[in-house]
Amino acid sequence: MRRDVFQAIADPTRRAIITLIAVQAMTPNALAEHFETTRQAVSKHLKILVECDLIKQNHRGREIYYQLEVDKMKEIDKWLEQFRKIWEDKFSQLDDVLLNLKKQ
């Protein structure tokens, strides 16, 4: 089953996993040490992230390391940029309104 990227990053545990492996590739066991959950639960989260192409697996000997798919993250960031600009404009307008209210 192919999952939606935003469905994948909606979960706080998966976002935390992304943050951890953004720094360095990690094994499921190493990742599981950062959470109060089972290794199996972490593996399920990893599977979802792999399905969405947010992370990839690299085999090193008998170990599997997970690392961030930087190109996919850039693609998401590029798509979000259009909304970032809209909200920056809205916040700027709100700042102007608040400044005018403060002057009154």
Regions found by a protein language model. Give the residues of each.
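N-terminal amphipathic alpha-helix
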Residues: M1-D11, E88-K90, D95
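N-terminal helix-turn-helix DNA-binding core of bacterial DNA-binding proteins
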Residues: R3-T38, E63-K74, K78
